A protein has these predicted regions:
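N-terminal helix-turn-helix DNA-binding module of bacterial transcription factors
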Residues: 1-15
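Residue-level detector of anion-binding/catalytic polar loops
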Residues: 5, 54, 103, 140, ...
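Short acidic/polar active-site loop segments enriched in Thr and Asp
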Residues: 5, 80, 139-142, 203
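Glycine-rich phosphate/diphosphate-binding loops that line cofactor/substrate pockets in enzymes
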Residues: 16, 133-142
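Alpha-helical recognition/docking segments in bacterial nutrient-uptake
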Residues: 16-132, 195-200, 211
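Hinge/beta->alpha junction and helix N-cap segments in small-molecule ligand-binding domains
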Residues: 26-39, 57-65, 119-129, 145-192, ...
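Flexible loop/turn connectors
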Residues: 188, 192-293
């Protein structure tokens, strides 16, 4: 009678089903640092809520939980799509998720042999930026602070590091590499052991992540080294602790909130209009210059 259109009101109701964000923990060495994980989840949530779905975050522990039972339970839930944190996963553990009857987007890891949708950080580019900056400032052969726990992300960062070393006319074989635990306390303890053994130290280092970089800086300072005057360090991830350590950490920033948004957007697109082709989206990195170089 009055010409009102009530059709839009129905669109605001929650849609049937939930988006599941699955955090897969194998050794828990990386995902246990929650701020990076939380930022990606917050990004997902902002997109999912706009589309009136619910987001449920669940964690699978490889050493404790049974994957077959876990996947069977997922089939009987209200799940309509999965965003799978691939950070700590191996290819053989991903395959069963791709057999589920709903779309999957893999976040924070890429598996060349699996046909799936991916949203990943551009690790090679970020590591290249960091290493090239180190070399331009120090004019010396850089070293590498490598995680003692291997991850695909770290392998890609090593490739970017070596690419920058090569492009600057330096030899890969001359790079000093220390394997350290990927946590602040663990890296500090491991680096103290490196120093106390009298191992050769590099003039500057790129670290697999900020936790390793911060632990290394703490160890160097405990043993009387001045950072960056004697040894420079660049991290990766731009975590909040890097801003408050002395000296503040030069690092690589990845927009994790945005990564979560993009992953959710891709999944929602697949739910609304399934397509045969898949894509890999790489989110670019930025160099954040502070005072550790």
């Amino acid at each position: 009678k009055y010409g009102y259109d009530f059709t839009k009101l129905s669109l605001k109701k929650n849609k049937a089903g939930s988006i599941y964000a699955v955090s897969y923990r194998s050794h828990n060495a990386i995902m246990s640092y929650s701020p990076i994980f939380d930022a990606m989840v917050e990004g997902m949530e902002s997109m999912v809520q706009k589309d009136n779905y619910k987001l449920k975050v669940i964690t699978f522990y490889e050493k404790r939980d049974n994957l077959e039972h876990y996947l069977e339970d997922l089939r009987t839930t209200d799940c309509v799509g999965i965003i799978l944190f691939g950070t700590e996963m191996r290819e053989e553990m991903v395959r069963p998720f791709l057999k589920l009857p709903f779309p999957v987007v893999i976040l924070d890891a890429y598996f060349e042999n699996l046909n799936c949708n991916y949203v990943v950080p551009n690790n090679r580019q970020g590591a290249y930026l960091a290493t090239d900056y180190l070399i331009s400032r120090r004019m010396k052969q850089p070293g590498y602070l490598q995680s003692a726990y291997p991850l695909r992300n770290f392998s890609e960062r090593l490739e970017g590091f070596y690419h920058a070393v090569h492009d600057n006319g330096m030899s890969r074989s001359r790079c000093i590499i220390h394997q350290l635990s990927p946590s602040i306390d663990g890296a500090m303890a491991d680096m103290l052991a490196v120093i106390d053994r009298g191992d050769a130290l590099a003039d500057c280092y790129f670290a697999d992540n900020d936790l390793i970089a911060i632990g290394t800086i703490k160890a160097l300072r405990l043993r009387g080294y001045k950072v960056p005057e004697q040894i420079a360090v660049v991290g990766f991830d731009n975590i909040s602790e890097g801003r408050i350590i002395d000296p503040a950490l030069t690092t690589i920033s990845i927009p994790r909130h945005y990564m979560g948004q993009v992953a959710a957007r891709e999944l929602l697109s697949q739910i609304e209009a399934p397509r045969q082709h898949t894509c890999k989206i790489e989110v670019s990195a930025n160099l954040v210059k502070r005072f550790s170089v």
